[in-house]
Design a protein with these regions (language model features):
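Conserved SAM-binding strand-loop segment of SAM-dependent methyltransferases
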Residues: 5-20
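A conserved beta-strand element that flanks and buttresses the S-adenosyl-L-methionine
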Residues: 33
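Short catalytic micro-motifs in class I SAM-dependent methyltransferases
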Residues: 36-37
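A short glycine-rich, Lys/Arg-flanked "PGG" loop and its adjoining helix->strand segment in the class I
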Residues: 45-60
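Conserved class I S-adenosyl-L-methionine
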Residues: 60-87
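A C-terminal cap/extension of S-adenosyl-L-methionine-dependent methyltransferases
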Residues: 120-174
Length: 182
């Protein structure tokens, strides 16, 4: 699609350790996509500061993270009461389950503290993972998608999604706020 629209030369994709992104960029960028990474890093605030430093004033952040509330709800619905009472410790060191599920309010606070302007929040899979009849995820997909779309930006459903997607802008006024912190 980017080739068809003639914008492919305006894009630059970098795959590297998040902590190293700044050294791979020649100038500030317009948009950073940071999906399903925050829940794997031990120092999330440091990473968010690094992302801030890579964006131009007015640039956007697309952030998606594994939601601790969704993990709790999933385990409660599954009847894993003992596991929840133990604080849901990670069972194995190397699994596909994220090391650090994130509390949404904490992530929002970190973003705002840095200077991001949060413009939208969306729960991802707010109902899908909680269906008792798993076959409905496929058999009733159109209805499920319509309801997910209808409720994904409303509380309490937003905060119960398996993931949360946040769109945030680096404001013009605060564009130099974090320079010394990176």
């Amino acid at each position: 699609a980017a080739v068809d629209k003639g914008v492919i030369d305006n894009m630059h994709f970098v795959q590297c350790a998040a902590q190293d992104i700044a050294q791979h960029l020649e100038s500030p960028v317009d948009l950073v996509l940071f999906h399903a990474v925050l829940e794997w890093v031990a120092e999330p605030q440091e990473i968010l500061h690094t992302l801030w430093s890579t964006l131009r004033a007015g640039g956007g952040l697309s952030l998606m993270f594994y939601n601790a509330n969704g993990l709790l709800m999933h385990n409660m619905v599954a009847g894993n009461f003992d596991y929840v009472q133990l604080g849901m410790p990670k069972k194995k060191k190397r699994t596909l389950s994220p090391d650090y599920p994130r509390e949404p309010q904490q992530v929002y606070h970190w973003l705002e503290e840095i200077g991001w302007q949060i413009v939208s929040k969306t729960g991802v899979r707010v109902f899908h993972d909680y269906l008792r009849e798993k076959r409905q995820q496929h058999d009733s997909y159109a209805a499920l998608l319509a309801l997910e779309t209808r409720y994904c930006r409303q509380e309490p459903y937003l905060s119960l999604g398996r993931y949360i997607h946040v769109t945030a802008l680096k404001s013009q006024a605060h564009s130099r706020r974090c320079k010394d912190k990176v």
